[in-house]
From Swiss-Prot:
First-listed, main subcellular location of the protein, grouped into a coarse class: cytoplasm
Transmembrane segments: none
Record-given protein name: Dephospho-CoA kinase
Organism annotation: Synechococcus elongatus (strain ATCC 33912 / PCC 7942 / FACHB-805)
EC category name: transferase
Gene behind the chain: coaE
Function per UniProt: Catalyzes the phosphorylation of the 3'-hydroxyl group of dephosphocoenzyme A to form coenzyme A.
Keyword Membrane: no
């Protein structure tokens, strides 16, 4: 039975997380397009807080020099990634600069959505940043580690060693699944994935009288 394009929900926040390259964006896009749910994405905020002219970008430039910027003044994310994923201390420093600003973006936009019965917060580092209390339900998008590694290498054009550095910077996906309310298996095709999302949504839908 097909789900309606717009439904009424129990009022809650869903924390959508998973590992790098496991398919969080695929699920988030489906929730937005199929159910018209507001999606607040930490990765989008992470780009916003380092935009040209931002205080966070200036702090990063002060630490790493002008070579951390592209010719147009934007952050060279690839170069920064090669630094922070090779050195946990540098990654911790960067998170100390960016995480408060990202949280402020979430709080700003959540304040505009107070009347929405459900909001999806896409937070890749939900567990690592200790943000479980921000949400009422946690969904983890998962796939086997080998598949995750292959997707990451091909998506971001990384060497196997660089991919391993990025995987090591997050909780293992199996550990995240242990703490999930809902696990979405994204190891097969999108139809399989979306069927699970529909089933999960049914658990939070309030049947209309």
């Amino acid at each position: 039975m097909g789900a309606p394009n717009h439904v009424n929900f129990v009022r809650r926040r869903i924390g959508l997380t998973g590992g790098i390259a496991t398919g969080k964006s695929t699920v988030a896009d489906y929730l937005r397009d199929r159910y018209q749910l507001p999606i607040l994405d930490a990765d989008r905020y992470a780009r916003e807080v380092v935009a040209v002219g931002s205080p966070v970008l200036q702090v990063i430039r002060d630490r790493y020099g002008a070579s951390i910027l592209l010719a147009d003044g934007q952050l060279d994310r690839q170069k920064l990634g090669s630094i922070i994923f090779a050195d946990p201390a540098e990654r911790q420093w960067l998170e100390q600069q960016t995480h408060p600003a990202i949280r402020a973006c979430f709080e700003r936009d959540l304040a505009q959505l107070e009347s929405d019965p459900i909001v999806v917060l896409v937070i890749p580092l939900l567990f690592e940043a200790g943000l479980q209390d921000w949400v009422e339900q946690i969904w983890v998008v998962a796939c086997p580690l080998e598949q995750q590694r292959d997707r990451l290498i091909h998506r971001d054009r990384l060497t196997p060693a660089a991919a391993e550095q990025r995987l090591a910077a997050q909780w293992p996906i199996a550990q995240k699944c242990e703490h999930a309310d809902i696990v979405i298996d994204n190891s097969r095709d999108r139809t399989f994935t979306f069927q699970q999302v529909d089933q999960a949504i049914e658990k939070v839908v309030v049947a209309e009288n």
